[in-house]
Design a protein with these regions (language model features):
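Polytopic transmembrane helical bundles with strong interfacial aromatic enrichment
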Residues: 2-515
Length: 515
């Protein structure tokens, strides 16, 4: 079905997509977060009639607009890459993956495009109520956009609601509701959007503390800090809660990712969660006998509680997942990776025989081949795997990025608590050390978001679609040099856009709120 493709092409195509996604995610969470904060500020203006809140909301809207424009540009490039660099993927599952993206474009993007114009240019031209509705609908459009994009991503992590049609060599959607409301999608949506609110709150607090540092616009800065810190605290706590739900879904649907997140090689009942650990760089393969840790501190039984909601449950490690033989929750015995690979190869062979028999008009042979294909279709993607060790993601990257995300998530809760205490009980405007802490927390918000996506995407390698299609089989057959060229062109373009956004934002921040 898929010709052999040079690994360097795979690596460069992955690098290009990762580059685009990383840059795009610089802008998206700030859009989601600022939308809520400026909506709350305009709501206060609508209810009180105090023009101070109108001016405050307009200032943050200005920064929202700058960020929104750059985010749209990078997002469009990201969607085009599915067709240019990942054509096998697009052909194989385009009927399913394309549906949520189409809905996102038709519904959410047009909602944003319509109401953002009213939000920016409708002051004193439409009623206060209609303008307020436009502001919230702009934010709602961005959130709906995130929903459908995350539905598409969640489907790649946990493919449901589809059936493979051997006549077209495509997966076709049979249950839209299952795709749109899968537990993986629901948890991913809330966790991701709430993390965007956290970043937006950090950004507003940080910029406001810069004004306090400069002894400018004290009332504006303190009022912005209070609104943003409350949003941030609620979002950070809820993000931790939804993160627990996401981890549970990973344990159920992507056990290899969970094992990589914990550097967990040998399964056991009552498995502990690594609170702190340093991986052994000498550990090269799962079965090399090298201790995976130089040191670690565990919370007893916490991984079993997290992954199965049972402190004594068995959690399979990397070696268990490769070797099989343990008992699954339904009472069946887990297959080894080698057995899954063999069954995947049977599925691919049966598919080829089916296509040949259909072309020759041999219905009897086609029926036999189709039966074999149906029986082994759950392992179809494994047929492209050459070595069982390919099924193990990058453990150090996944392990450390997970801890970066979790540690920073805990720090953000503490940060917002301290900010609120100082804003209400102390004179925050005079605490210059806190101003610097707030400013330095801004990049930490971005790092936490990128770390989360590194866990989500790198932790499911080698799969483009979990258990169904590996990255090596999803790619377009392109000239490696052309991918390298566009990689560096995108790197230059995105860097220019990022520098432009930072420059325009800094200019707007220095100018300050209108008086």
């Amino acid at each position: 079905m898929v010709e052999h493709i040079d690994t360097s092409l795979i690596d460069w195509s992955r690098a290009q997509f990762a580059l685009t996604a990383i840059y795009h995610w610089i802008f998206v969470p700030l859009t989601l977060g600022l939308a809520v904060i400026m909506g709350l500020m305009e709501t206060i203006y609508y209810r009180t009639g105090n023009d101070f809140w109108r001016r405050t909301a307009k200032f943050w809207m200005k920064l929202f607009g700058i960020n929104f424009a750059i985010g749209v540009a990078t997002g469009l490039i990201l969607e085009f890459e599915f067709g240019t660099n990942w054509s096998n993927y697009s052909w194989f599952v385009g009927d399913i993956f394309g549906a949520p993206l189409a809905i996102e474009g038709i519904l959410a993007f047009f909602m944003e495009a319509t109401f953002i114009a009213v939000m920016f240019f409708g002051w004193n031209k439409v009623s206060k109520g209609f303008h307020l509705a436009s502001t919230w609908l702009t934010g709602l459009g961005a959130t709906i956009s995130a929903w459908w994009i995350l539905v598409a991503n969640a489907w790649m992590q946990y493919p449901v609601g589809m059936a493979f049609n051997p006549d077209t060599a495509r997966n076709e959607m049979v249950d839209f509701l299952a795709v749109a409301t899968s537990p993986m999608a629901v948890n991913k949506f809330f966790h991701t959007v709430l993390s965007g609110w956290v970043l937006g709150a950090i950004f507003v607090v940080g910029v406001s503390c810069w004004y306090l540092w400069k002894r400018r616009d004290k009332q504006f800065a303190l009022s912005s800090v209070k609104v943003a810190a409350w949003v941030g605290l609620v979002a950070a706590v809820l993000s931790a809660w939804t993160g627990d739900g996401s981890a549970y879904q990973v344990a159920q649907k992507q056990p290899m990712k969970l094992a990589a997140m914990e550097g967990y090689y040998d399964g056991q009942e009552g498995a502990g969660l690594v609170a702190f650990g340093i991986l052994n760089p000498q550990k090269q393969t799962p079965d090399d006998g090298v201790d995976p840790f130089l040191m670690r501190i565990e919370i007893p039984k916490m991984l079993s509680l997290l992954g199965e909601r049972d402190a004594d449950a068995f959690i399979p490690g990397i070696n268990d997942l490769l070797e099989g033989g343990y008992t699954l929750k339904d009472g069946s015995t887990a297959l080894s990776a080698e057995e899954k690979i063999a069954r995947g190869q049977m599925a691919i062979t049966a598919f080829a025989k089916y296509r040949k028999a259909k072309a020759e008009g041999n219905d009897e042979e086609a029926q036999v081949a189709r039966q074999t294909l149906t029986e082994n279709m759950p392992y179809f993607g494994y047929g492209y795997i050459k070595d069982a060790n390919e099924l193990v993601p990058n453990v150090p990257l996944t392990f450390y990025m997970f801890r970066v995300m979790v540690i920073l998530g805990g720090y953000f809760i503490l940060f917002f608590l301290v900010v609120l205490f100082l804003a209400y009980k102390r004179n925050l405007s005079k605490l210059r050390w806190m101003h610097m802490v707030a400013l330095w927390t801004i990049p930490l918000g971005y790092i936490a978001g990128q770390a989360g996506w590194a866990v989500a995407e790198c932790g499911r390698q080698p799969w483009a679609i979990q258990d169904m299609l590996p990255v090596s089989a999803a790619i377009s057959k392109l000239d490696t040099g052309s991918v390298q060229l566009t990689f560096f062109l995108f790197l230059i373009l995105f860097t220019i856009l990022l520098i432009a956004e930072i420059g325009i934002m800094l200019k707007a921040i220095r100018k300050g709120v209108e008086h």
